[in-house]
């Protein structure tokens, strides 16, 4: 008797399961498309009906569009979207990557990112473009071409809170002599750049507001791409594949990293890797060349390079260029502002590192562990390197070939020197280490970043530790 009852119960459960699957199967592509259209619209009754059908459907294809909607103000309709996501299981076990605790959007976004094969509705890319055009900026729709190749999951592209070019790039900005830069204090931090014998300083108090400078330095077109969220300023050559590119801010993020776009094709590029990831050039194989850049104090840069030019505060934009004005609280907090689901847990997300990629190998050096001042010898991708850290904490990396350098930096005649074990001195330059008889060891293109940003795109990164 008990066996018969158990058989009946099992059959009932199986029937319920099959019934749920059948119910899910009843949401045809046409009905789904109609609901997604209603979710884009302004007709409240249709919006609510679509949410209700999503809630009862058990169809996972509703999840990604509902998550997109949660990113925007919905008023009292937010409860209906959250209820639908809950019924679809997208609020079970989501962590939000340690940010926005208790916020449904973060939880659901983390849940979706954890799915090995997320189910997306037909036409999702075009739908997302229409949503962003309606809710943020009509110009954003052109980024979401359904025919374009994408090297990243489109459902994980996030809105960064601004319109396209809402963070305006600086194009060949006005420069002034160091002596005329009275608006800067000695401790203000700057990106120091030297290309073709010409030096330039880009104060962070200005770049915090613009995040991109398209410029010409030493007759070379360059773009200084700065992601404030991941703490990384990367200097790129503007030349790639025989073309010259200039860049702007798309207003979009991936892994809490700025997606910049080129103005020539409207392709989205990864700011940290210099690669096109979504759009006309995503399949091109292009990659921007990294160039050396250093973050140091204005006093140190001006002392080492009295001939330097520096950005004028007359940028043409009405901004408060007080240091730390737009992101000071974020820089001081250990919290992230947006999800970075691919970040490595080896270190806290906002640990600052100096990062290098050589011979196909990525390596990160936690700033707090580096000598200040001092030098370390190491290998990256089988290439011998030496990192020199000055008294401001500025880090420069050079090839060292078969030479062995001591751990001490010395000051003499207004310059900084490293010494080989045999006592021969090498002067730190922006392009190279310069040794006896004019010998040169090339500077390498490393830069700073928060650990979460770097490890999201270089998950196999080796981490240097103190001997």
Listing of model-derived features with the role each one plays in the protein:
Residues 1-4:
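Positively charged n-region of N-terminal signal peptides that target proteins for export
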Residues 7-17:
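Bacterial N-terminal signal peptides
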Residues 11, 22-23:
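Cleavable N-terminal signal peptides
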Residues 23-27, 45-58, 65-69, 76-91:
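Structural detector for internal amphipathic alpha-helices that build alpha-solenoid repeat scaffolds
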Residues 26-38, 59-70, 92-107:
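Amphipathic alpha-helical scaffolding segments comprising HEAT/armadillo-like alpha-solenoid repeats
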Residues 40-44:
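HEAT-repeat alpha-solenoid elements in large eukaryotic scaffold proteins
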Residues 67, 90-467:
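Mid-to-C-terminal functional-domain signal that highlights helix-capping/loop sites
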Residues 74-81, 96-97, 120:
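Boundary/linker segments of alpha-helical solenoid repeat arrays
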């Amino acid at each position: 008797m008990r066996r018969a009852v158990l058989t009946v119960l099992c059959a009932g459960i199986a029937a319920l399961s099959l019934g749920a699957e059948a119910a899910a199967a009843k949401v045809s592509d046409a009905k789904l498309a109609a609901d997604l259209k209603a979710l884009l619209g302004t007709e409240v009754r249709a919006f609510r009906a679509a949410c209700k059908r999503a809630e009862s459907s058990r169809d996972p294809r509703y999840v990604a569009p509902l998550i997109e909607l949660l990113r925007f103000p919905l008023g009292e309709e937010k409860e209906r979207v959250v209820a639908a996501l809950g019924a679809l299981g997208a609020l079970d076990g989501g962590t939000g990557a340690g940010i926005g605790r208790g916020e449904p959007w973060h939880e659901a976004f983390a849940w979706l990112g954890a799915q090995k094969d997320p189910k997306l509705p037909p036409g999702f890319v075009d739908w997302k473009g229409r949503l962003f055009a309606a809710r943020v900026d009509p110009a954003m729709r052109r980024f979401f071409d359904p025919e374009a190749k994408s090297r990243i999951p489109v459902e994980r592209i996030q809105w960064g809170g601004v319109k396209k070019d809402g963070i305006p790039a600086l194009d060949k900005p006005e420069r002034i002599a160091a002596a005329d830069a009275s608006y800067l204090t000695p401790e203000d931090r700057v990106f120091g750049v030297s290309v073709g014998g010409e030096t330039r300083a880009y104060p962070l108090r200005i770049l915090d507001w613009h995040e991109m400078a398209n410029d010409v330095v030493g007759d070379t077109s360059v773009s200084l791409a700065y992601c404030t969220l991941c703490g990384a300023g990367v200097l790129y050559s503007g030349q790639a594949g025989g073309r010259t590119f200039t860049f702007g801010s798309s207003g979009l993020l991936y892994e809490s990293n700025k997606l910049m776009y080129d103005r020539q094709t409207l392709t989205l590029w990864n700011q940290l890797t210099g690669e096109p990831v979504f759009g006309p050039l995503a399949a091109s194989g292009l990659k921007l060349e990294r160039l050396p850049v250093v973050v140091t104090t204005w006093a140190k840069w001006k002392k080492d390079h009295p001939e330097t030019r520096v950005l004028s505060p007359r940028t043409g934009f009405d901004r408060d260029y007080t240091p730390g004005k737009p992101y000071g609280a974020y820089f001081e907090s250990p919290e992230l502002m947006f999800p970075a689901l691919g970040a490595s847990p080896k270190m806290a997300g906002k640990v600052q590192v100096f990062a290098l990629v050589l011979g196909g190998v990525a390596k990160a050096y936690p700033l707090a562990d580096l000598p200040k001042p001092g030098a370390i010898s190491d290998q990256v991708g089988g290439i011998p390197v030496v990192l020199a850290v000055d008294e401001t904490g500025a880090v420069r990396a050079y090839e060292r070939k078969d030479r062995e350098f001591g751990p001490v930096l010395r000051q003499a005649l207004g310059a900084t020197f490293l010494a080989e074990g045999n006592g021969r001195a090498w002067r730190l330059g922006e392009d190279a280490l310069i040794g006896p008889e004019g010998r040169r060891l090339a500077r390498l293109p490393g830069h700073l970043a928060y650990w979460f940003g770097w490890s999201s795109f270089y998950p196999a990164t080796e981490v240097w530790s103190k001997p």
